[in-house]
Protein backbone atom coordinates (compact mmCIF):
# COMPACT_ATOMS: atom_id res chain seq x y z
CA UNK A 1 0.00 0.00 0.00
CA UNK A 2 1.36 3.42 -1.02
CA UNK A 3 -0.03 6.60 0.52
CA UNK A 4 0.46 10.28 -0.25
CA UNK A 5 0.26 12.77 2.61
CA UNK A 6 0.32 16.33 1.48
CA UNK A 7 -0.35 19.74 2.91
CA UNK A 8 1.45 23.02 3.51
CA UNK A 9 4.70 23.30 5.51
CA UNK A 10 3.86 22.78 9.18
CA UNK A 11 0.62 20.87 8.49
CA UNK A 12 1.77 17.81 10.43
CA UNK A 13 2.63 15.52 7.53
CA UNK A 14 5.64 14.10 9.32
CA UNK A 15 3.66 13.33 12.47
CA UNK A 16 0.89 11.58 10.55
CA UNK A 17 3.41 9.76 8.35
CA UNK A 18 5.01 8.27 11.48
CA UNK A 19 1.57 7.11 12.60
CA UNK A 20 0.90 5.48 9.21
CA UNK A 21 4.32 3.79 9.20
CA UNK A 22 3.30 1.97 12.38
CA UNK A 23 -0.26 1.34 11.22
CA UNK A 24 0.62 -0.33 7.90
CA UNK A 25 4.21 -1.42 8.65
CA UNK A 26 5.43 0.93 5.93
CA UNK A 27 8.26 3.35 5.30
CA UNK A 28 8.16 7.13 5.51
CA UNK A 29 9.49 8.77 2.37
CA UNK A 30 9.91 12.28 3.71
CA UNK A 31 11.05 14.66 1.03
CA UNK A 32 12.07 17.11 3.74
CA UNK A 33 14.21 14.49 5.50
CA UNK A 34 15.80 13.44 2.21
CA UNK A 35 16.65 17.07 1.43
CA UNK A 36 18.04 17.67 4.94
CA UNK A 37 20.18 14.50 4.57
CA UNK A 38 21.69 15.92 1.39
CA UNK A 39 22.38 19.20 3.20
CA UNK A 40 24.05 17.33 6.09
CA UNK A 41 26.24 15.44 3.61
CA UNK A 42 27.33 18.86 2.33
CA UNK A 43 26.98 17.50 -1.21
CA UNK A 44 26.65 19.71 -4.28
CA UNK A 45 22.94 18.89 -4.32
CA UNK A 46 22.80 19.76 -0.62
CA UNK A 47 24.32 23.19 -1.29
CA UNK A 48 21.71 23.90 -3.99
CA UNK A 49 18.97 22.74 -1.63
CA UNK A 50 20.07 24.96 1.26
CA UNK A 51 20.21 28.03 -0.98
CA UNK A 52 16.66 27.39 -2.19
CA UNK A 53 15.33 26.67 1.31
CA UNK A 54 16.96 29.76 2.82
CA UNK A 55 15.37 31.85 0.06
CA UNK A 56 11.98 30.34 0.93
CA UNK A 57 11.84 28.51 -2.41
CA UNK A 58 11.06 24.90 -3.13
CA UNK A 59 13.80 22.64 -4.40
CA UNK A 60 13.68 21.94 -8.15
CA UNK A 61 11.48 19.11 -9.41
CA UNK A 62 14.53 17.58 -11.09
CA UNK A 63 16.40 17.12 -7.80
CA UNK A 64 13.37 15.90 -5.85
CA UNK A 65 12.23 13.50 -8.58
CA UNK A 66 15.67 11.86 -8.72
CA UNK A 67 15.74 11.33 -4.96
CA UNK A 68 12.20 9.88 -5.00
CA UNK A 69 12.93 7.57 -7.93
CA UNK A 70 15.75 5.85 -6.00
CA UNK A 71 13.37 5.04 -3.15
CA UNK A 72 10.53 3.77 -5.33
CA UNK A 73 12.77 1.32 -7.17
CA UNK A 74 14.25 -0.07 -3.95
CA UNK A 75 12.56 -3.47 -3.44
CA UNK A 76 12.42 -3.17 0.35
CA UNK A 77 10.04 -0.20 0.01
CA UNK A 78 7.79 -1.64 -2.70
CA UNK A 79 4.10 -0.98 -1.93
CA UNK A 80 4.99 0.24 1.57
CA UNK A 81 5.65 3.94 1.03
CA UNK A 82 4.16 6.89 2.83
CA UNK A 83 5.00 9.93 0.67
CA UNK A 84 5.41 12.85 3.04
CA UNK A 85 5.70 16.18 1.22
CA UNK A 86 5.71 14.78 -2.30
CA UNK A 87 4.39 15.61 -4.84
CA UNK A 88 4.26 19.39 -4.55
CA UNK A 89 3.86 20.28 -8.21
CA UNK A 90 1.84 18.92 -11.09
CA UNK A 91 5.08 17.81 -12.77
CA UNK A 92 6.02 15.85 -9.63
CA UNK A 93 2.55 14.28 -9.45
CA UNK A 94 2.74 13.12 -13.07
CA UNK A 95 6.31 11.91 -12.51
CA UNK A 96 5.18 9.89 -9.49
CA UNK A 97 2.39 8.24 -11.50
CA UNK A 98 4.87 7.31 -14.26
CA UNK A 99 7.51 5.93 -11.89
CA UNK A 100 5.00 3.91 -9.88
CA UNK A 101 3.40 2.50 -13.02
CA UNK A 102 6.80 1.47 -14.39
CA UNK A 103 7.48 -0.40 -11.12
CA UNK A 104 4.01 -2.05 -11.02
CA UNK A 105 2.86 0.04 -8.08
CA UNK A 106 0.09 2.57 -7.48
CA UNK A 107 -1.15 5.11 -4.96
CA UNK A 108 -3.80 3.59 -2.71
CA UNK A 109 -4.71 6.64 -0.62
CA UNK A 110 -4.17 10.38 -0.90
CA UNK A 111 -4.63 12.48 2.24
CA UNK A 112 -4.58 16.27 2.07
CA UNK A 113 -4.03 17.92 5.47
CA UNK A 114 -5.70 21.28 4.97
CA UNK A 115 -4.42 23.90 7.42
CA UNK A 116 -4.79 27.70 7.38
CA UNK A 117 -1.76 30.00 7.50
CA UNK A 118 -2.46 31.28 11.04
CA UNK A 119 -2.42 27.75 12.46
CA UNK A 120 0.83 26.96 10.63
CA UNK A 121 2.55 30.02 12.10
CA UNK A 122 1.54 29.03 15.65
CA UNK A 123 2.79 25.47 15.10
CA UNK A 124 6.13 26.59 13.70
CA UNK A 125 6.65 29.02 16.57
CA UNK A 126 5.98 26.18 19.02
CA UNK A 127 8.20 23.75 17.07
CA UNK A 128 11.11 26.23 17.15
CA UNK A 129 11.29 25.78 20.92
CA UNK A 130 11.22 21.97 20.65
CA UNK A 131 13.56 21.19 17.75
CA UNK A 132 16.07 23.16 15.71
CA UNK A 133 15.37 23.27 11.96
CA UNK A 134 16.99 25.78 9.63
CA UNK A 135 13.69 26.32 7.79
CA UNK A 136 11.69 27.13 10.97
CA UNK A 137 11.74 30.90 10.62
CA UNK A 138 8.34 32.64 10.53
CA UNK A 139 9.18 34.78 7.50
CA UNK A 140 10.54 31.79 5.58
CA UNK A 141 7.50 29.71 6.54
CA UNK A 142 5.11 32.46 5.38
CA UNK A 143 6.86 32.65 2.03
CA UNK A 144 6.94 28.84 1.71
CA UNK A 145 3.25 28.61 2.66
CA UNK A 146 2.24 31.11 -0.04
CA UNK A 147 4.46 29.41 -2.61
CA UNK A 148 3.07 26.02 -1.59
CA UNK A 149 -0.54 27.15 -1.98
CA UNK A 150 0.21 28.64 -5.41
CA UNK A 151 2.09 25.55 -6.61
CA UNK A 152 -0.24 22.94 -5.17
CA UNK A 153 -3.54 24.14 -6.55
CA UNK A 154 -2.92 22.10 -9.76
CA UNK A 155 -1.88 19.07 -7.65
CA UNK A 156 -5.08 19.35 -5.61
CA UNK A 157 -7.09 19.55 -8.83
CA UNK A 158 -5.17 16.57 -10.25
CA UNK A 159 -5.78 14.31 -7.23
CA UNK A 160 -9.13 15.56 -5.92
CA UNK A 161 -10.94 13.81 -8.78
CA UNK A 162 -9.67 10.43 -7.58
CA UNK A 163 -11.94 8.23 -5.48
CA UNK A 164 -9.00 7.63 -3.10
CA UNK A 165 -8.51 11.36 -2.31
CA UNK A 166 -9.47 12.52 1.19
CA UNK A 167 -9.25 16.02 2.64
CA UNK A 168 -8.68 16.16 6.39
CA UNK A 169 -8.89 19.20 8.65
CA UNK A 170 -5.24 19.48 9.62
CA UNK A 171 -6.06 22.09 12.28
CA UNK A 172 -7.49 19.37 14.51
CA UNK A 173 -5.43 18.33 17.52
CA UNK A 174 -2.59 15.99 16.58
CA UNK A 175 -4.19 13.07 18.40
CA UNK A 176 -7.51 13.52 16.53
CA UNK A 177 -6.14 13.24 13.00
CA UNK A 178 -5.26 9.50 13.08
CA UNK A 179 -8.93 8.67 13.74
CA UNK A 180 -9.90 10.68 10.64
CA UNK A 181 -7.29 8.80 8.59
CA UNK A 182 -8.41 5.44 10.00
CA UNK A 183 -11.98 6.15 8.93
CA UNK A 184 -10.82 6.03 5.30
CA UNK A 185 -8.26 3.20 5.46
CA UNK A 186 -9.35 -0.32 4.63
CA UNK A 187 -6.78 -1.94 6.91
State where each predicted segment sits.
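Glycine-rich phosphate-binding loop of ATP-dependent small-molecule kinases
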Residues: 1-187
Amino acid sequence: MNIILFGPPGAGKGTQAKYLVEKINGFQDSTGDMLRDEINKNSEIGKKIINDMNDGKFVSDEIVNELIKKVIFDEKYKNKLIFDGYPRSLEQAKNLETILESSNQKIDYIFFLNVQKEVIIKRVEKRKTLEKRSDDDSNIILKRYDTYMDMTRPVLDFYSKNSNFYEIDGALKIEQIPAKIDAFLNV
